[in-house]
Regions:
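Generic alpha-helix initiation/capping and coil-helix boundary signal
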Residues: 4-10, 43, 77, 84
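Sec-dependent N-terminal signal peptides
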Residues: 1-19
Length: 255
């Protein structure tokens, strides 16, 4: 199930770096997800697990309820708008640079599960993901967000990540929380071996849309509980015309 790690990795990138320990480096396969303790016997289901996790995230954010945590929108403070605009301007430079997705691939971005049909494809740079665990560089987003058009990809946005250990005050230092709302995925019960397909079915117990939200309930059903599976993340759409669309929470939920 380490590929569930690889899949969940995309969104939250860098759980290992936030803990700063060799043990957590096993979680780098999936940005922001540390499932390093999973049994080796799960390895045969890696591809399925990845697809399940991707499916759970794809277009279902609004259904996640207790599986998603959003930062609170703060009262604007002096300098917030200017600071956020600096991030937007840097992101626009990124958009121009990587408009051709081949450039992104040549510079180390990897398509996250290209074999899984998605509304939006994350091209993830794991070196930038590592950097994001320690400092914030808006010119180095963890992921580039592309929409597929035939055999081509159209760049529509970027994704920044931050360690799951960060407080909201820490996140506010990166991008003011009066402007942007970060989110993380929580209360994840991984399905036991042989039952991964259940995460894709109707009324699932397991996964990001599952009914199980507590450690006790997960144990009782043979699953493996993870209080947080991704690092903090925020999507930014810098080519939009106004701040509401650039930092759109609704679009972030839907993507």
């Amino acid at each position: 199930m380490k590929t569930l790690l690889t899949l969940l990795c995309l969104a939250g990138t860098l759980s290992f770096a936030q803990q700063n320990s060799p043990q957590d480096m096993k979680g780098m396969n999936m940005p922001g997800h540390d499932m390093s303790q999973m049994s080796a016997q799960d390895s045969g289901e890696d591809a399925d697990a990845s697809a399940h996790a991707m499916h759970s995230m794809e277009g279902h954010h609004m259904d996640m309820g207790p599986h998603m945590k959003m930062t609170a929108l703060r009262t604007p403070q002096a300098g917030d708008a200017e600071k956020a605009q600096q991030v937007v301007e840097a992101a626009r430079g990124v958009m121009e640079k990587y408009k051709d997705y081949h450039v992104a691939l040549n510079e180390g971005f990897k398509i996250f599960h290209p074999e899984v049909p998605q509304k939006q494809y994350h091209f993830t740079n794991y070196r930038y993901a590592m950097q994001a665990a320690f400092n914030f560089n808006p010119e180095h987003p963890t992921s580039l967000l592309y929409e597929k058009n035939g055999d081509d990809y159209r760049l529509v946005g970027v994704m920044y990540t931050a360690p799951k250990r960060f407080t909201e005050d820490d996140l506010n230092q990166r991008i003011p929380l009066s402007i942007a709302q970060w989110h993380e995925h929580v209360n994840f019960c991984a399905a036991p071996t042989g039952r991964k397909q259940e995460m894709l079915g109707p009324n699932p117990k397991f996964g990001l849309r599952g009914s199980i939200i507590t450690h006790q309930e997960c144990d009782a059903n043979g699953g493996e509980f993870h209080p947080i599976i991704f690092n903090w993340m925020v999507h930014l759409y810098p080519l939009e015309k106004d701040a509401a669309q650039i930092w759109s929470v609704d679009r972030q939920h839907a993507d």
